[in-house]
Amino acid sequence: MIKAVAEQSGNTYMLDANVPPHITIAGFETRREDEVIEKLRCALSEQEQGTLTWAGVGAFFPNVIYVEPVLNEYLHKLSVIVNESIINIEETKLRKCYQPFQWLPHATIGKKLSEDEMVKAFMALQKSFGMFEGNVIRIGLAKTNPYEDIASWELLSKG
């Protein structure tokens, strides 16, 4: 979908910045990156994979378009686990808009879009988007602006 939006709108920011499809389940600033990694490693070591239903398309105006999963029990639980794992780490400040019950799960597929590019992005999705399911198989830790992967954890297979 990121590629389709880029091709239709002409805005290639997501591709140029190498931002992979993802849902942000916690946002924070810290000076204790190693401690965050260790806390998340412990918290996620027994976490199983789960299924999400992607049901809609939305926008953060004026220039972001996203696809939206249904906030089910599994996704809420992941949000709680990650946020609770890092909330008490010194010199770590959680971003309020990514905390449980204050968060809109989404996967950005177009960013820094002009008004015309936003219209074209919606047109691309109108032609191609339909409700679908996908599995959560990995949790990653990344820096933003520019995007940089820091760590990732493969989740346990169900069963």
Regions found by a protein language model. Give the residues of each.
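Glycine-rich beta-strand-turn "strand-cap" elements at beta-sheet edges
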Residues: 57-60, 136-149
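Basic, often amphipathic N-terminal segments
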Residues: 1-51, 74-133, 150-159
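Acidic/polar active-site rim loop that often engages polyanionic ligands
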Residues: 60-63, 102-103
